[in-house]
UniProtKB/Swiss-Prot annotation:
Knocked-out gene: effects: Cells are hyper-sensitive to actin depolymerizing drug, latrunculin A (Lat A). Deletion mutants are unable to complete septum formation upon LatA treatment, but are able to suppress the lethal, multiseptate phenotype conferred by the constitutive hyperactivation of the septation initiation network (SIN).
Compartments (UniProt record): Cytoplasm; Nucleus
Positions of region (Disordered): 269-293
Stated role: Cyclin subunit of the CTDK-I complex, which hyperphosphorylates the C-terminal heptapeptide repeat domain (CTD) of the largest RNA polymerase II subunit. As part of the CTDK-I complex, involved in RNA polymerase II transcriptional elongation and pre-mRNA 3'-end processing. Together with ctk3, required for ctk1/lsk1 CTD kinase activation. Together with ctk1/lsk1, required for the regulation of cytokinesis by phosphorylating 'Ser-2' residues found in the heptad repeats of the CTD.
Domain Cyclin N-terminal: 26-151, 158-241
PANTHER family, sorted: CYCLIN (PTHR10026)
GO terms of biological process kind: mRNA processing; positive regulation of DNA-templated transcription, elongation; positive regulation of transcription by RNA polymerase II
Family, as annotated: Belongs to the cyclin family.
Name of the protein in question: CTD kinase subunit beta
Length: 335
């Protein structure tokens, strides 16, 4: 190994999805009040996106990035609004809808301080923007590292439109399903299941809301009933606890949504499928604990670095990592 070559201390592979057990393990150690703060962050992203005229796919991806960020970093460790804005910055670049960074910072300041009259070209405005610039840039870097610079994204809306056309749904039903897809970004379901499963679940919920018979889902949709029902459960849970923060919640009464949830739970019990919650070992470390420990080791080692890889390169770099760790232990005389 060359003397000036940085040692790869950590190899991080992109994980587009996490299991129900992995997410539950992280959330079991968190304050339930964090969910309310997460909804505040989503409201901030939605309002800022409307101000900057971002499309739904950009604001939705920003919410998805924020949910991932909050899994690995508790709310009390990060500035809420600045983190939400940083996620929106990353999402705008991934979706190729980027705005000038200065315009985003200015919109961030004006939204944080409503009613303030600041000239966008004044020296005062420049100083106010610079105060948040470094902080948001730092959070942007953390977000990029958290997703391992993996910019592959699939949105449920695209699948939903294709499925709705295939099933010959009316425009009103498709419109409701579209809003359900948008609400799905405010849950963890987008981190657990592929976008096409979320699309099928959204169509099912839209049919229930309009009291239409459930469509027969073709096998070509590749949407197993068990996965679809798991997504439906997550979205209905959002409507039960955070109705005012959702698109559908503003279209239907609480009684309507509550009845929908009760009917779904009753159908789940009668289906005969086991409804066992994931078994969580309280003594095992979570993904968030391991990630923070890895960051700590990198900060303590001045000459080490992390390597970010996609799934196709995992085998090669895992072998390389094992060789380097063995070499390090030999140099220290521990082998």
């Amino acid at each position: 190994m060359a003397e000036n070559e940085n040692h790869v201390l950590s190899i991080r592979m992109s994980h587009p999805y996490y299991s129900e057990k992995e997410i539950s393990r992280i959330l079991s150690t968190r304050d339930p009040k964090e969910n309310n703060l997460r909804m505040q962050a989503f409201a901030w992203i939605s309002t800022l996106s409307k101000t900057l005229k971002f499309p739904v796919r950009t604001s939705g991806l920003a919410m998805l990035l924020y949910s991932r960020f909050q899994l690995f970093f508790p709310v009390n460790e990060i500035p809420l609004l600045e983190c939400a804005t940083a996620c929106l910055v990353v999402a705008s670049k991934i979706e190729d809808t980027a705005k000038k960074f200065r315009d985003i910072l200015l919109a961030h300041y004006l939204q944080k301080h409503p009613g303030s009259e600041v000239d966008a070209h004044s020296q005062v405005c420049y100083k106010l923007i610079e105060e948040n610039k470094k902080r948001i840039l730092g959070l942007e870097r953390m977000t990029l590292e958290l997703i391992c610079f993996d910019f592959r994204v699939r949105h449920p809306h695209n699948y939903m439109v294709k499925f709705a056309k295939s099933l010959k749904f009316s425009s009103s039903t498709a419109s409701i399903a579209w809003n359900v897809c948008t609400d799905a970004y405010k849950t963890y379901t987008m981190l657990k299941y592929p976008a096409h499963i979320v699309a099928v679940a959204s169509i099912s919920i839209a049919c229930k809301l309009q009291q239409l018979p459930q469509p027969i889902i073709p096998r070509s949709f590749f949407a197993p009933p068990a996965l679809t029902e798991a997504v439906i459960a997550d979205i209905l849970d959002l409507y039960m606890h955070y109705q005012p923060h959702t698109c559908i919640g503003n279209m239907y009464t609480t009684e309507k949504l509550l009845g929908l949830c009760v009917d779904f739970q009753r159908a789940q019990k009668n289906s005969g499928r086991p409804q066992k919650p994931p078994q969580i070992d309280p003594h095992s470390s979570s993904l968030a604990d391991e990630y923070r420990e890895s960051n700590k080791r990198l900060q303590e080692s001045k000459e080490s670095c992390a390597r970010f890889i996609l799934d196709c390169d995992r085998k090669y770099f895992n072998t390389e990592f094992e060789k380097r760790m063995l070499e390090e232990r030999r140099n220290k005389g521990t082998v």
